[in-house]
Curated annotation (Swiss-Prot):
Could be the regulator of the abg operon. GO terms for biological process: regulation of DNA-templated transcription. Residues 22-41 bind DNA. Residues 5-62 form the HTH lysR-type domain. GO terms for molecular function: DNA-binding transcription factor activity; transcription cis-regulatory region binding. This is HTH-type transcriptional regulator AbgR. Disruption phenotype: Cells lacking this gene may lead to an altered expression of abgT. Keywords: DNA-binding, Transcription, Transcription regulation. It comes from Escherichia coli (strain K12). Disulfide bonds: none annotated.
Amino acid sequence: MAFQVKIHQIRAFVEVARQGSIRGASRMLNMSQPALSKSIQELEEGLAAQLFFRRSKGVTLTDAGESFYQHASLILEELRAAQEDIRQRQGQLAGQINIGMGASISRSLMPAVISRFHQQHPQVKVRIMEGQLVSMINELRQGELDFTINTYYQGPYDHEFTFEKLLEKQFAIFCRPGHPAIGARSIKQLLDYSWTMPTPHGSYYKQLSELLDDQAQTPQVGVVCETFSACISLVAKSDFLSKLPEEMGCDPLHGQGLVMLPVSEILPKAAYYLIQRRDSRQTPLTASLITQFRRECGYLQS
């Protein structure tokens, strides 16, 4: 008879992988360390594969463990979503929604939508992850994020996810007040200055980099920031230049008094998409939240 993986073994395996140790996982699961170790051992024996490297300071996943983790974590998230879906369809409007979004979306679109949704469903917990799409791919794959609203450009993900265009945002070049570049009217006049940008692996910045390369107008980026807030702070308090969403650079709360440089070149707009796994089935409350984001995008674009 073929070995049948049990759900408690999946939970044990995923928690050990996340905590990096039997001790940490046993605390999270409220299990004894011997019972947890036995569960992992039985799982490895049943699969005929070593899932962890055991070391004095903890455990790390083997190649087989990495592969199994992708499936196991998705199984747990799908099970959670299925249970919440049934409860919500029975009128128990509670649970958790996990969403990701780009920094510009979190500072413009998100506050109105989330505050309204929370007033309607105060018992629902919403977890928000901010960043570029590249930083969220694994969470989307594993079901740890229900959806994200982010930029996307010619990536290898078309077969995994659906992409629904929601809105576009204009980008511009910014500097601090009093910067010697003020008065420049073209990107070529700015190429000798120091630049900082969010990670070039991000979808929009990859598109922008390719466009400027074609036009021989690529600035030398000396500092790469993983967050927009770090990028904005560096521009505000130094001589670095950067390309940012117009609304973020012009907002006194987030832009810290930045100055937009009126260059003659028009930067391409960034398209933002609702991105979901192709095989995902959203719970009623998650579908309702998505609808509210769609409506807010329509309002902002009108």
